[in-house]
Amino acid sequence: MATIDIRRAHALSTDEAKKKAETLARGMEDKLGIKWRWEGDRIKFDATSGAAKGVTGVVSVDPKSVRVEIDLPFLLRAIKGTIESRVNEKLDEVIGRA
């Protein structure tokens, strides 16, 4: 079960939603050193070093929503609320609200 689980409705085409999800993943890669890869309609990501070390997760895209599931290592759970707020802000910026 994910430590953080956020679903955001969208009114985009699936292809456009996938492009937006990739923008989100690239931002995590640039800022946190997270590695990511597409597996079907899902981006799987993890961090093996840096401030986000131990973080794993998935960004799933379907025709009506984008879902972000993040598993935080024990030490980062203390700032779960901050991380969740930042993910929501980034989703607002990249995907918007339907």
Map each language-model feature to its residues:
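Terminal, regulation- and interaction-focused segments at domain boundaries
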Residues: 1-34
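Phosphate-end processing signature that detects enzymes handling 5′-triphosphorylated RNA
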Residues: 7, 37, 67
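Ser/Thr-rich, low-complexity intrinsically disordered terminal regions
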Residues: 22-23, 27-63
